[in-house]
């Protein structure tokens, strides 16, 4: 029996840039998917969250449109890549909320991959884990995500954010201020629109790159956007500005300038809301209230359309600010919201 802890992730800055090979700045966080498992002839897993057991044989990898597809996807991708593994029997638990924009799917997939790697001695290196988990989500589960989530879950390092160029996969660890916490606010709004709207934005972004003849959004300057049709210009303009903001946050963090980091995050949120059109009134409410209560900055994190937002706050004030916003939020909105105080943490491991 082995026990694996696979973290969720928060993206500090660089939202909706990874599918055009731009810059991102995620971190693994101290909320986890936990998997306890042993070798077995089949796959038998009990999910605490769903309160049910699912099982399948290794020669039946048909999709079931349930949480077990994330597991099947990992077995499928290993088979596709000529790795030989047997089954597992075990239990999935943890404190990482599902559907909250904190990459529970990537956390789960990478956790299953790590479990199989250790049980069957696959000797996978870190980048292979990232690429295999991404392929499983893209090609088996059918979610057209970029590389950000899996990279953060695998490469996370305690006390650091990751500055990642998703084009070259060059990365750099940047220390996060020790006296600052990240307040994560889950709005309770399920992201029903996210899959179709996300796919539309990804399609428009990819078309924009083709029109401009570029391999990455990093190569595009604001002056070139006039070559694009109006909606493409609006959406892709956001991506170009967001790439620049990631570089600005990198520099501000290195200088220890938390105030500047906060301002950039807030600017990013309103650009996401007004020009990329992926916010909602609940996310905007959190950002406005967090700033009024003393946050350095705040923005939605993840795909948007609900899910979660983050605020940078002094560690000593984090819980108070979180409780106050939650109290006001619950008076105004009918959703079951929650808040978490998180810190940059290590990636997947035993």
UniProtKB/Swiss-Prot annotation:
GO molecular function: ATP binding; galactokinase activity; magnesium ion binding
Active site: 149
First-listed, main subcellular location of the protein, grouped into a coarse class: cytoplasm
Annotated site residue numbers, Transition state stabilizer: 9
Residues that bind Mg(2+): 105, 137
Keywords attached to this entry: ATP-binding, Carbohydrate metabolism, Cytoplasm, Galactose metabolism, Kinase, Magnesium, Metal-binding, Nucleotide-binding, Transferase
Any single Gene Ontology cellular-component annotation: cytosol
Positions of ATP binding: 47, 99-105
Binding positions for substrate per the UniProt entry: 15-18, 198
Any one GO biological process: galactose metabolic process
Enzyme class: transferase
EC number, as in UniProt: 2.7.1.6
Compartmental location: Cytoplasm
Catalytic activities: alpha-D-galactose + ATP = alpha-D-galactose 1-phosphate + ADP + H(+)
Gene3D superfamilies associated with the record: 3.30.230.10, GHMP kinase, C-terminal domain
Pathways involved: Carbohydrate metabolism; galactose metabolism
Origin: domain of life: Archaea
Family: Belongs to the GHMP kinase family. GalK subfamily.
Main function: Catalyzes the transfer of the gamma-phosphate of ATP to D-galactose to form alpha-D-galactose-1-phosphate (Gal-1-P).
Protein name: Galactokinase
Lineage of source species: Archaea, Methanobacteriati, Methanobacteriota, Thermococci, Thermococcales
